[in-house]
Amino acid sequence: MSEQLVTPENVTTKDGKINLLDLNRQQMREFFKDLGEKPFRADQVMKWMYHYCCDNFDEMTDINKVLRGKLKEVAEIRAPEVVEEQRSSDGTIKWAIAVGDQRVETVYIPEDDRATLCVSSQVGCALECKFCSTAQQGFNRNLRVSEIIGQVWRAAKIVGAAKVTGQRPITNVVMMGMGEPLLNLNNVVPAMEIMLDDFGFGLSKRRVTLSTSGVVPALDKLGDMIDVALAISLHAPNDEIRDEIVPINKKYNIETFLAAVRRYLEKSNANQGRVTIEYVMLDHVNDGTEHAHQLAELLKDTPCKINLIPWNPFPGAPYGRSSNSRIDRFSKVLMSYGFTTIVRKTRGDDIDAACGQLAGDVIDRTKRTLRKRMQGEAIDVRSV
């Protein structure tokens, strides 16, 4: 369990009420205890909030009137609002969601046997990966718990409503939207706890995936806080290329990153012993057969499956998407070494909802020095 403190600063709304979406179950029970109520009352309210996407205390019919009145005085259930919706020809839906005076983007991806929600963890991103649209927006701030779990809540409510008739309920959540989740552990972990909680969304830990570009101290900390599936944004077979396209590699190189991944796998049950490697395919940058051989050698001691991601363009980007033939040759080399290798099907690129295309609406781009300071505060690891 995470140990984020429930304080007026991090859960109180502008009108002085506690937003219950900011509280995981442990914190919710503490809140109800302070109200003089039994812990099971907290569980009842959570069930209404997440099983039925209910944000009106008066509709919680198994909660007595006195408690409902008390809750209306001191608390609320306020999820961020959708301000724009775009639908792709392939069924993907992208929502622009208001967080204060800015926006983040959340993507719903339906498939035959599942529906995946791609969730953002920050407004913008500080890591400056060269092939990613979000990185070009700069970093503004971390999202609160209510703004992270609120994306899932809002999407579940929309999908369950008549306006999205026929859409599958959300079965998987991936922390692969805007931002680096490990730079916002204090909010991301409680939000994921709610995703997993039986009184929350009740998802399997194998169906909640966190993706990271390699903030090593925070990855070590994550393994002591929660067990979820892990995906890593590797994107290069050597430090020379990765230094260029994923600048955090200059601080935590590939060897250091993969060692941390193996430490996480030793603690984790959710990953079933292997990590997902994400590898964006950039034309004549990292997609040659020689790169595939290097990657196979690099990963020989790391149990994994490999997702090859055709790069999704955005205005002003200096790269091109690898051709299908180059991707096919790359994939065949990896499979010849025995690696499970999947070429990710591009979804939602006609509405800029594909991997690496999320941008949101980030204002007042933060200066590099402030971003570095915020990174350290966000994960509470002074050595970062």
Swiss-Prot record:
Annotated protein name in UniProt: Dual-specificity RNA methyltransferase RlmN
Residues binding S-adenosyl-L-methionine, per UniProt: G179, E180, S211, S233, L234, H235, N312
The gene coding this protein: rlmN
Lineage, uppermost ranks: Bacteria, Pseudomonadati, Pseudomonadota, Gammaproteobacteria, Enterobacterales
GO biological process, one term: rRNA base methylation
Active site: E105 (proton acceptor), C355 (s-methylcysteine intermediate)
Catalytic EC class: transferase
Binding of [4Fe-4S] cluster, residues: C125, C129, C132
Annotated EC: 2.1.1.192
SS bonds (residue pairs): C118-C355
One matching Pfam family: RlmN_N
Cofactor dependency: [4Fe-4S] cluster
